[in-house]
From Swiss-Prot:
Function: Cell wall formation.
Disulfide bonds: none
NCBIfam families: murC
Gene Ontology CC: cytoplasm
Protein name: UDP-N-acetylmuramate--L-alanine ligase
SUPFAM superfamilies on file: MurCD N-terminal domain, MurD-like peptide ligases, catalytic domain, MurD-like peptide ligases, peptide-binding domain
GO biological process: cell division; cell wall organization; peptidoglycan biosynthetic process; regulation of cell shape
Protein species of origin: Methylobacillus flagellatus (strain ATCC 51484 / DSM 6875 / VKM B-1610 / KT)
Compartment annotation: Cytoplasm
Reaction catalysed by this enzyme: UDP-N-acetyl-alpha-D-muramate + L-alanine + ATP = UDP-N-acetyl-alpha-D-muramoyl-L-alanine + ADP + phosphate + H(+)
Keyword field contains DNA repair: no
UniProtKB keywords: ATP-binding, Cell cycle, Cell division, Cell shape, Cell wall biogenesis/degradation, Cytoplasm, Ligase, Nucleotide-binding, Peptidoglycan synthesis
Gene Ontology molecular function terms on file: ATP binding; UDP-N-acetylmuramate-L-alanine ligase activity
Length: 475
């Protein structure tokens, strides 16, 4: 690629998937530029590596670009896309650039509606512990490296495979993981769940004859597509059919202890401690163990990496104990969960990790279409918290949909009668609302995928200021 392409421009460079690819390209020696609507820690990091960044979108930002990479959120009428089209500069989706990177290494691609980021991070951490120095591109910040991407010297590249726009079908990995299949991003698939499942079948069928499909046998939709898969399959899960199986699962102090049974020619067992809470994370760890086993990683490296795993940014990220107004302390957690299934798993993990404590959930819905399609499920999962603070929907470029907004959710939760929700106009107001409400011993979870990402940090900052200054002085 490099003899023809020297300058790569990213439209929407601040997104987690885009920024990771940009960072790898910078480390490979390419000239990188990009634009986004707002400056953030990710764009500042890329600027530190030498990327030329622009706030906002304009045709002149293209400069001498040889190719333009766009995220699925970028529209056809974006001025940079229009200018690239007029100048006959190739315009490619993010996944196609990721596929180009994967061509020169052995690819491990992780797909699924939920759990992609954590599973990808666990695999990268295990391979790093084994001395295999992988390249990785992750949809969140891997705390151990402080980044969502890294160019390694090893032969493997570990990356998330995005089904939201079906672009994961561009990838050509040697190992493909499917964590689960759920009804999300249904606009892409014409609101036809069978089409969505068919895309996952095609994703797995793109494996070479020597490739391996690592799949969660516990997920009913994954199980349903297995008869259509002609490649080698490594099923994992809690069920007896799993060849990588967890048993004796116990939660303790925010960690999970379990026994792994691996059936791969011979049967072996070993005990694991995972430095994350929740059974859903155990499933993610089993996927990582399956991949590592396929690559002949020693069990010692697997055990050590899982026990020492430092987590991923905004995936049950713990901010520690935060001062409450009543003189005590509450536990603050930040999470990216934005689909009811993910939220339910996070709440269950919090109940296991902090039994008997009041659970306060501050949530920003993401996309009007998802809110509409999963409305009743959102009402149910939000009603399972003890206290609910809800903001308006983060549009992600979508037009508002009647009866699929934040206030409609609040009304429906109130009618359900299990909890009295509080509507907070904007995420910027959430930190103060949380501090007004949180009590000693509470567990406060800030959750969502939109503009809520800085709320937990701001809440902690304001609480620590208020601990030393009368609250009236900081209002």
């Amino acid at each position: 690629m490099k003899h023809k392409v020297k300058h790569v421009h990213f439209v929407g460079i601040g997104g987690s998937g885009m920024s990771g690819i940009a960072e790898v390209l910078l480390n490979l020696g390419f000239s990188v530029s990009g634009s986004d609507l707002a400056d953030n820690a990710t764009t500042r990091r890329l600027a530190g590596f030498g990327a030329k960044l622009y706030q906002g979108h304009a045709a002149e930002h293209l400069g001498e670009s040889d190719v333009v990479v766009i995220s699925s959120a970028v529209k056809d009428d974006n001025p940079e896309v229009v200018a690239a089209r007029e100048r006959n500069i190739p315009i490619i989706p993010r996944a196609l650039m990721l596929a180009e990177l994967m061509r020169f290494r052995q690819g491990i691609a992780i797909a699924g509606t939920h759990g992609k980021t954590t599973t990808t991070s666990l695999i990268a951490s295990i391979l790093a512990e084994a001395g295999m120095d992988p390249t990785f591109v992750i949809g969140g910040r891997l705390e151990a490296s402080g980044s969502n991407a890294r160019l390694g010297t090893g032969e493997y590249i570990v990356a998330e495979a995005d089904e939201s726009d079906a672009s994961f079908l561009h990838l050509t990995p040697i190992i493909s993981v499917v964590t689960n299949i759920d009804a999300d991003h249904m606009d892409t698939y014409g609101h036809d769940f069978e089409r969505l499942k068919g895309a996952f079948v095609e994703f797995l069928q793109r494996l070479p004859f020597y490739g391996m499909a690592v799949v969660c046998i516990d997920d009913p939709n994954v199980r349903a597509i297995l008869p259509q898969i002609s490649k080698q399959v490594m099923p994992y899960g809690f069920s007896e059919e799993a060849r990588i199986r967890a048993s004796n699962v116990q939660a303790e102090n925010g960690r999970m202890h379990f026994t792994v049974t691996r059936i791969n020619g011979v049967t072996t067992t070993f005990d694991v401690t995972l430095n994350l809470p929740g059974r859903h994370y155990v499933l993610n760890a089993l996927a990582a163990i399956a991949v590592a086993s396929e690559l002949n990683v020693p069990d010692g490296a697997i055990i050590k990496a899982l026990a020492e795993f430092k987590g991923v940014g905004r995936r049950f990220e713990r901010y520690g104990e935060v001062p409450a107004r009543d003189g005590g302390y509450f536990t603050l957690v930040d999470d990216y969960g934005h689909h009811p299934a993910e939220m339910n798993a996070v709440i269950a993990a919090a109940r296991d990790a902090f039994p008997g404590r009041r659970l306060v959930l501050a949530f920003q819905p993401h996309r009007y279409t998802r809110t509409r399609d999963c409305f009743e499920d959102f009402v149910k999962v939000l009603s399972s918290a003890d206290v609910v603070l809800l903001t308006e929907v983060y549009a992600a470029g979508e037009a508002p949909i009647v009866a699929a907004d934040g206030r409609s959710l609040v009304r429906a939760i109130r009618v359900a009668g299990k909890v009295e929700p509080l509507f907070v106009e904007t995420p910027q107001e959430l930190p103060q609302s949380i501090l007004d409400m949180a009590q000693d011993g509470d567990v406060v979870i800030v959750m969502g995928a939109g503009s809520i990402g800085q709320v937990a940090a701001r809440t902690k900052e304001m609480a620590e200021v208020a601990e030393h200054v009368p609250m009236e002085a900081v209002r």
